[in-house]
Amino acid sequence: MLERIKDSFTESIQTKIDAAEALPESIAKAAEMMVHCLLGGNKILACGNGGSAGDAQHFSAELLNRYEIERPPLPAIALSTDTSTITAIANDYSYDEIFSKQIFALGQPGDILLAISTSGNSGNVIKAMEAALSRDMTIVALTGKDGGAMAGLLSVGDVEIRVPSNVTARIQEVHLLVIHCLCDNIDRTLFPQDEQQ
């Protein structure tokens, strides 16, 4: 059992090393897009299922509250938090529409959708992306494995941050690190700090 625990740490470290080689440019581009969105008076909507729903909420909380520096709140909404809305849509329509219907109501041109799925094949996240595209929103997709069907929906103006792993747990671990990198870049671009602080 101890070896298995050590192996999990080793695999996680190696996946992060691989991600550090593969992902910085796409993370920087996504952060730049998010800064542009926020400076334009727009907002970021985030969605995912299970652990990815938690990641969407984590990202939203970091923007609405703060990440590491004191700053004004930034507009972000996790679409996975309103149980009344989610269960009403799932009951009356389909679970695949729990995010897309919210995007049709809340999304505006210039907003960004942060779409999170370790497989890239979550039906409701794909529907959310389709809704975002119809609302002239930009998409930042956090994926893993081969990018799944989500990768095929992205256009030149969108960004995919695909973790180089096929293991769901390792992908989720890197997704959290990517979210922290995005928050750090957003904060330091919008609110430059003296590095001495």
From Swiss-Prot:
Binding site for substrate: N49, G50, G51, E62, N91, D92, S117, T118, S119, S122, Q172
Enzyme Commission number(s) from the entry: 5.3.1.28
Subcellular location: Cytoplasm
A Pfam family it matches: SIS_2
Domain (SIS): residue spans on this chain: 34-196
Gene3D superfamilies: Glucose-6-phosphate isomerase like protein, domain 1 (3.40.50.10490)
CDD domains (alphabetical): SIS_GmhA
Transmembrane segments: none
Cellular-component GO terms for this entry: cytoplasm
Cofactor(s) required, per the database record: Zn(2+)
Top-level division of the source organism's lineage: Bacteria
GO molecular function annotations of the record: carbohydrate derivative binding; D-sedoheptulose 7-phosphate isomerase activity; zinc ion binding
Keywords for the protein's UniProt record, in alphabetical order: Carbohydrate metabolism, Cytoplasm, Isomerase, Metal-binding, Zinc
GO biological process per UniProt: carbohydrate metabolic process; D-glycero-D-manno-heptose 7-phosphate biosynthetic process
Reaction(s) the record says it catalyses: 2 D-sedoheptulose 7-phosphate = D-glycero-alpha-D-manno-heptose 7-phosphate + D-glycero-beta-D-manno-heptose 7-phosphate
Cofactor binding, per record: Binds 1 zinc ion per subunit.
Keyword Cell membrane: no
Primary enzyme class: isomerase
Function (record text): Catalyzes the isomerization of sedoheptulose 7-phosphate in D-glycero-D-manno-heptose 7-phosphate.
Subunit-structure text: Homotetramer.
Record's miscellaneous remark: The reaction produces a racemic mixture of D-glycero-alpha-D-manno-heptose 7-phosphate and D-glycero-beta-D-manno-heptose 7-phosphate.
HAMAP family: GmhA
Name this polypeptide is given: Phosphoheptose isomerase
Taxonomic source organism: Shewanella baltica (strain OS155 / ATCC BAA-1091)
